[in-house]
């Protein structure tokens, strides 16, 4: 299965440029229908806005954008370029503009819609969708902190920790790195700590 970046969650941010108010929003979506539904939702919510420009990218599917009445190439295209530069898939972005009475010009509009998309993406965060190996690792307390550092070094996620006679860890690691991680634990602890592979999951985690 492929690895690809998606937005972690809904993200929203806004700014004012020469009295025009710009509100940028992004959502994670799985289908073009979901993306179009979000766009329609924003058009209804901001029916009084001057423009509701949008862009979306669906993995192995549609790439679409709209200037929604702004001069051609000044809104939707800059927004889609932000999403592409950020490497994101399964994402829809809407930038709403309330006109403030001062014209921005073509260059100013491109900069404003680029900024609107970028700050919304930053607010949403990024997650990597990939195959993760699920590992069960029981360890003595003396190794707990060192193992946490190794999990981080290998790009893993410590999902659950149980404290009893020893520490029991549930760890998710990128599929390609899990065996190297287990080998590292064996070497680091002189064989004291051994992990078990308990399954796999295909999901996204923040990066």
Model feature map: region roles:
Residues 1-73, 196-205:
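C-terminal regulatory domains involved in ligand/effector binding and gene-expression control
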Residues 61, 71-88, 163-165:
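Positively charged, aromatic-enriched nucleic acid-contacting surfaces
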Residues 77-123:
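Active-site beta-strand/loop microenvironment that shapes enzyme catalytic pockets
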Residues 126-143:
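Short glycine-/aliphatic-rich beta-strand segments at the starts of folded cytosolic domains
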Residues 138-156:
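Short amphipathic alpha-helix segments
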Residues 147-152, 180-189:
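Short amphipathic alpha-helices in soluble, non-transmembrane regions
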Residues 158-162, 189-206:
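Conserved short beta-strand edge segments in small beta-sheet-based binding/regulatory domains
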Residues 171-178:
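Terminal, non-globular segments
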């Amino acid at each position: 299965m492929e690895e690809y970046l998606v937005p972690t969650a809904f993200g929203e941010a806004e700014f004012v440029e020469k009295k025009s108010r710009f509100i940028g929003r992004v959502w994670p979506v799985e289908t073009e229908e979901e993306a179009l539904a979000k766009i329609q939702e924003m058009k209804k919510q901001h029916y009084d806005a001057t423009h509701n420009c949008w862009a979306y990218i669906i993995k192995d599917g549609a790439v679409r954008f709209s200037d929604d009445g702004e001069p051609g190439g000044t809104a939707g295209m800059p927004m889609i370029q932000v999403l592409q530069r950020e490497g994101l898939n399964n994402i829809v972005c809407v930038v709403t503009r309330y006109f403030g009475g001062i014209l921005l010009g073509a260059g100013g509009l491109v900069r404003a819609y680029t900024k609107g998309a970028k700050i919304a993406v930053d607010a949403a965060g990024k997650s990597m969708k990939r195959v993760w190996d699920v590992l069960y690792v029981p360890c003595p307390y003396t190794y707990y902190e060192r193992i946490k550092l190794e999990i981080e070094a290998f790009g893993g996620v410590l999902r659950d920790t149980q404290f009893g006679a020893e520490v029991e860890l549930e760890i998710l690691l990128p599929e390609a790195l899990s065996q190297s991680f287990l080998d590292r634990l064996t070497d680091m602890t002189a064989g004291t700590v051994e992990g078990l592979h308990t399954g796999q999951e295909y999901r996204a985690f923040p990066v």
